[in-house]
Amino acid sequence: MKTQFAILLITLVLFQMFSQSDAILGEIWKGIKDILGKRGLNDLSDLDELFDGEISKADLDFLREIM
């Protein structure tokens, strides 16, 4: 009886671990597909507009004011 109970507990624990890891791996796979999909790559190109490599005079004045 003790052996059957131990096997049942071990089976339940392993099943719980499998079901949780399946959910985590599913979310990771979904994120990878979102990033590497056509729409995901198009969305990443929108981030290029956020960075402007040139520093204007107003930016320099603001940095001097902070220092």
Curated annotation (Swiss-Prot):
Main subcellular location: secreted
One CC-aspect GO term: membrane
Signal peptide limits: 1-23
Tissue expression from the record: Expressed by the venom gland.
Protein origin, superkingdom: Eukaryota
Keywords (A to Z) from UniProt: Amidation, Antimicrobial, Cleavage on pair of basic residues, Membrane, Secreted, Signal, Target cell membrane, Target membrane
Propeptide: 40-67
Subcellular location as annotated: Secreted; Target cell membrane
UniProt modified residues of type Leucine amide: 36
Protein family: Belongs to the non-disulfide-bridged peptide (NDBP) superfamily. Short antimicrobial peptide (group 4) family.
Function in brief: Amphipathic peptide with antimicrobial activity. Does not show antiviral activity.
Name assigned to this protein: Peptide Hp1165
Organism lineage: Eukaryota, Metazoa, Ecdysozoa, Arthropoda, Chelicerata
